[in-house]
């Protein structure tokens, strides 16, 4: 992508409405634009990041055995009345009526709809276990939306729902998602700590929040420092193996970890003082096992191997991509801007033409842009007439991991400068060497 043809409205000043770093940087870099309270447009730069975050989530959901579908944002009130949650959910749920005066709602969650889909098609235990997920917009009418897309009213969610014959199967499904979430957050450059959580309006008796540590987090968290060094499940993880899933779950729940809502001071004090960690954190994922809460109310049953009807056991598993993006920024930035982890940056490499219109610079930049693009990189070419300082500031604030700087003096010697955005390390080399080095490190 040539920057001269890309829509990226950079703001020179810090927006007054932004209270935290991620909100400020997302507005300044032109990633998002507020349309009304808690509702945002994702502009091209932000959409590129969001798409890459979603791609990682999809890969790990698919790896764990979940199957993608897509449910609508608008739901019939009848399903919620059937489950008993229509009146209980409260004012966060946006209720509307269609032209036939039928009550509808803008879905804040999808337990009722997915249960209705399941009961319509699945009749036998032979079709279990089953885990279905989608990535879709939701709406919750927050009293006080704040912090940009960190706590907005309309937001994107990945929701997965598992269906099993009995509790043992459901707990295995829960542990599969537990391991999948650890892998997902690690690939997004985050160390997420699973903490026992309240089930809230979704219900159930087993739940974990996945929390990343950040000074701007809304939650106060208490945990053992060992979590910072635990190994993440590898690519070869066998999600079907019960023993493997049990081992991962037991390891990651063997140490104390709790948010302030679930905190037990005596248990935390029992940890040796040097191994305690108290900090603030951001919730980036939440998983629930809620047994037969919805399946019982809505008649989701299958014939078991004994020939009798069994009410299925369910779980739900949520990750908010539009919340994850600012969470990643909160965990990875400096005074100059965002530092994106590789793989989710809007671009992999930015080629900075220090003197657009200079034949030697234009030729070298053209080659870098072409060859690196053919090698599979997402490349941004800054071919604008902006002054050098402005180009460097733009490259830094949008957080592209690698900068290749092409100036008339260096290119006269056949050389360019390669800068690592995270470390600030710089290295001068030939154009050929720069291409080879970047391709080899891919």
Curated annotation (Swiss-Prot):
Give the superkingdom in one word.
Bacteria
Q: Which CDD domains match?
A: ProRS_anticodon_short, ProRS_core_prok
| Pfam families xrefs | HGTP_anticodon, tRNA-synt_2b
Stored Gene3D superfamilies: Anticodon-binding domain, Bira Bifunctional Protein, Domain 2
What EC numbers are recorded for this enzyme?
6.1.1.15
Question: What Gene Ontology molecular-function terms does this entry list?
Answer: ATP binding; proline-tRNA ligase activity
Q: Where mainly found?
A: cytoplasm
The top EC class, named as a word, is ligase
Give a GO cellular-component term. cytosol
Instruction: Tell me the compartments it is located in.
Output: Cytoplasm
User: Mind listing the GO biological process terms from this record?
Assistant: prolyl-tRNA aminoacylation
Q: Which InterPro entries match?
A: aa-tRNA-synt_IIb, aa-tRNA-synth_II, aa-tRNA-synth_II/BPL/LPL, Anticodon-bd, Anticodon-bd_dom_sf, Pro-tRNA-ligase_IIa, Pro-tRNA-synth_IIa_bac-type, Pro-tRNA_synthetase
Q: Which reaction does it catalyse?
A: tRNA(Pro) + L-proline + ATP = L-prolyl-tRNA(Pro) + AMP + diphosphate
Provide the alphabetized UniProt keywords: Aminoacyl-tRNA synthetase, ATP-binding, Cytoplasm, Ligase, Nucleotide-binding, Protein biosynthesis
**Spans traversing the lipid bilayer:** none
Subunit details for this protein?
Answer: Homodimer.
Query: Which HAMAP family does the UniProt entry name for this protein?
Result: Pro_tRNA_synth_type2 (MF_01570)
Function field: Catalyzes the attachment of proline to tRNA(Pro) in a two-step reaction: proline is first activated by ATP to form Pro-AMP and then transferred to the acceptor end of tRNA(Pro).
Give the family, as the similarity comment puts it.
Answer: Belongs to the class-II aminoacyl-tRNA synthetase family. ProS type 2 subfamily.
Q: What is this protein called?
A: Proline--tRNA ligase
State the species of origin.
Sinorhizobium medicae (strain WSM419)
